[in-house]
Amino acid sequence: MPQSTLPKRQPQRRSQVPSSVLGSVTVGLEEFIQSQGAESQPVLSRAGLKPGLYQQPNRHISLKNYCNSMHEAARATGNEHFGLWFGEQFAPEGLGLFGYQAITSPTLRDAISGMEQWFHVFQRNSLLNFSSSGGICQ
């Protein structure tokens, strides 16, 4: 199996900057909240997010607030699996180049390797690792 010739990105020291994620993760969130029976604006507001973040897909938003939006949406809709259902219907293309790299990779290994390599662009102050040993991926 071909190995990447690019140097492996080393984890950076933990900084005082809060973890963040690209606003593209909110593509379709408002509509999905409403399709599950809740009003999106109050849900996002309680989570510390503003409506329309999907219109600025390259802007970083607080990861904590994004995770809170999943909890608030689950509570507001009564669907304890809200986050899973949102993720299931989310199109990877919505993640921009990060998602496009994953879906156009020739193998799953290449997709995960590319995601690991470029994760720091998509999500800041977070870590994603992938390793395989004896045919088992971790």
Identify the role of each PLM range:
Residues 1-138:
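N-terminal low-complexity or simple alpha-helical regulatory segments
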